[in-house]
Amino acid sequence: MKTAAELRQLVTRIDHRSYPAYKDTKGMYQFPGYLLSIDHVQGDPFASPSRVSIQVKGKIAGFPEQLYRTKWQKTALEDALIRQFGQCCEKFGFKAKGSGKSGMISISRCGQEVLERSAAQIDEKTGDIHIRLEVGFPANGRTINAREWIRIFFEFLPECVEKALYYKNCDAKRLQKISDLAEDQQALRDILPKLGLCAFVANGSILPRESGVSARPMKSAVCFQSPEEMEVEITLPHRGVIRGMGIRKGITLIVGGGYHGKSTLLKALELGVYNHIAGDGREYVITDSTAVKLRAEDGRSIKKTDISMFINDLPNGKDTTHFYTEDASGSTSQAANVVEAMEAKAGVMLIDEDTSATNFMIRDELMQRVIHRDMEPITPFIERIRELYEEEGISTVIVAGSSGAYFHIADCIVQMDRYVPKDITQTAKKEAEQFPQLSGPKEKAKKPDFARKPQQGREWKGNDRIKMKTLGKEAISINRETIDLRYVEQITDSEQVTALGYCVKYAQRHLLDGTRTLQEVVAMLEEKIEKESLAALCESTSSVANLARPRTQEIFACFDRYRGLKL
């Protein structure tokens, strides 16, 4: 390991040389108070910036163990450190001048959700801090600008480290509040099943967002207030007593007029699988962490999924126990999404009528009279929803605005009236008595077969040059094969998409051999991340990308939409 002085001498020596000479800086250097590692050097000032990491010993950083003693507190502290370091980066970004990306200093940008990220890691045993960032090495044209480079690494970064990564220079009260909030959120998440709840929305929560492109809370929004009949009281370790609407396990129907807040409530519930930062308005909107938002997804591929509990006796004689298509219809795609959510061990399904296939959700009486049941291959979701709960323990929350078909089978019916929820279960049930319930399915469905065993694709054998590109939150391209994730609506960050791409790459190289089921493959991926961190997916310290941890359910969703998956 070299010293900081040796690094300065090296950069001074290569000043004004051709840009590739920066490659000589790759390595580890001891700075006062921290270790600097230059992991990857860009080949050109206009290329993706260089990757740099900083390690601070726990004794020097000085963060109290009480701030990271549990997994969720550790993630919250890491998130806070990324935000603090990011603020410092913004202060110095592009202050060092030059061509292309010269002077760029950046770290992962965190949103409203608190996610585990590769950008910051704290060793729970030693308190050591590992920060990963990107730096644009300065150049004049395509020649090295050592003077500006030295400003970044000997002036700007040392100040960022001192201000953001040393506890003595941080706001101790703020960090304690962040830790306490994380502990309260986890306590609330843990207590839901004990109370027979699948979700909780605290009184005073702000559910609407600022705009379609901003996840910040709407300033003029109506604060959430639980109906008296659904209000529950919970005592948290730090916040104390908190009250709000408890959504019980079973079948919950959310109804109301257009623009009254139905979908806004459902959106808050679907993102309640994540913890949110203080001030977001949804800090205490907590949903079963395995909940999955489902919808129709015309055109998606389906790979040997057993959809026979919903679709049978197709006119073309196609086998629906191992259904395969490259262009699914709305109803078929939604049926596959339900079964795949079961495979991913979802405990709650969240469905909005607006984005569902009508013929998958219901069949009204007139249609059943005109088109006999024996002529219809689709068993609608309404005929399986009770079975899903009673046999599989899967609860469902449905938003409906045009059909009252689900009134008969719902356990709880909530009306959104000018953004205020009301429990109208008894009233709606009484009205529903005047409309006889349609007959249910003739027999219970056979439990889907989850024995799919993916194999390694031919293009992966002996090929170390597989290219991958993240396309925002919507898709990822692997070896020119695009995995469309537009309708996996609980992905909140493009870094989660990048992580999903690395999950696929790692699985293709190490796990897919035709002997393991997809469930076993995903379990092994989760185990690796849990034991070795997200960065372990990248397999090389020089190639660690900006990653955010996806849930198990999103890992399944990615494989399910991977057209190149060989089964």
Q: Where would I find each of the regions flagged by the language model?
A:
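Conserved alpha-helical scaffold flanking the Walker A/P-loop in AAA+ ATPase domains
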Residues: 329-341
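Glycine-rich phosphate-binding P-loop
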Residues: 242-274
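N-terminal accessory targeting/assembly segments
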Residues: 1-196, 207, 567
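N-terminal pre-Walker A segment at the start of P-loop NTPase domains
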Residues: 208-243, 278, 286-302, 307-318
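Conserved P-loop NTPase nucleotide-binding/switch module
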Residues: 341-385, 389-390, 402-408, 412-429
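Flexible beta-alpha connector loops of hexameric P-loop NTPases
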Residues: 145, 300, 310-331, 363-378
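Carboxylate/His-rich catalytic cores and anion/metal-binding grooves
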Residues: 193-197, 203, 259, 266-297, ...
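Conserved NTP phosphate-binding and transfer environment spanning the P-loop NTPase/kinase superfamily
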Residues: 390-393, 399-567
